[in-house]
């Protein structure tokens, strides 16, 4: 039966979209089988197959990546990471490369850049050999100089599946862009010696980014949501070791940079042995607005600070000089609901302490480490519409849970769920 002109034109109009999604080139990355540096071969494949291609790192094959890889003009490319990558283990040589201006070992940029790792847990790993770097950190140091971050990934309309990172030296992945889905990732920065400073899992900025069904064991934020982020979801994940949790910020360090974040949801997450679980951090003197944020169904086991907000963030390595103490990044419509589990009473903190007092205890002189909730609002107007519901957290000592609360006024926070004060935590719904 002949089709109408209207239907024909409609089908014709979709042809460019169909063609845009087709990846017509399959490019297999060659390997030296461990005999030399494979970086030149990898860079050549990325250059030759930068558009409408599938780039294959073969399963069961090892690749030595001894020089940084920059692929900044990609478009509609799938990276099939079925082999295992190995970064160099010569610390001084890598430091010289970083000093020359290479902050990230891998830089991937362009629309529709997908990452597909192997479903076999033995394949698809990036091995950074961070343990030697962490062990080289001197006493009271916060990480040796010129550490490379692993991956800068800037894309849109992309899917990242089965990305696996073993012992990243510093930040694991800077993920910027729009409409990105991450599933079944593993970040393993578990240390057998020195503390793994700054081993962030995913530093995120963009719109409509979802990270789910993943595992992150590290020594900094599992996820850190930065300014300019909207519609971010972090769900069904397990995070821990000495993690700094599900974090927003830090924001407002530069008083001239207006922070803007909306619509974040952290849900159905298990947090094990971490310093923080749900965390917001902004600097005194900052400006901006963070609105509509929810942490829900969070299970914590041996966590020092399960719910933590500070608008007076402090960095043990920073000196900001004079700032406007009355200025804050504003927080509005925040909800914490259905938190269960144990507070780390007996061995609170983590291995990142390099100052006295420890950076995470600064400004909290009367800590008992039975605190279920700490809310440090900078002013009486900087926190609005805070809600807590069904907070079932208990100290390991079996003492009553406590709270520290500053400036979350009842007038601006009628559903806060407790009286904002320092002392024993009792939900208003539990009172008779």
Swiss-Prot record:
It is an enzyme of class 3 (hydrolase). GO terms for cellular component: extracellular region. The keyword Ribonucleoprotein does not apply. Disulfide bonds join 377-383. GO terms for molecular function: galacturan 1,4-alpha-galacturonidase activity; polygalacturonase activity. It is found in: Secreted. Keywords: Cell wall biogenesis/degradation, Disulfide bond, Glycoprotein, Glycosidase, Hydrolase, Repeat, Secreted, Signal. PbH1 repeats lie at residues 206-227, 229-250, 261-282. Its EC number is 3.2.1.67. Residues 1-20 form the signal peptide. The active site is at 220 (proton donor), 244. Glycans are attached at residues 33, 73, 90, 140, 260, 292, 302, 407. GO terms for biological process: cell wall organization; pectin catabolic process. It comes from the Eukaryota. Specific in hydrolyzing the terminal glycosidic bond of polygalacturonic acid and oligogalacturonates. Belongs to the glycosyl hydrolase 28 family. This is Probable exopolygalacturonase C. It comes from Aspergillus terreus (strain NIH 2624 / FGSC A1156).
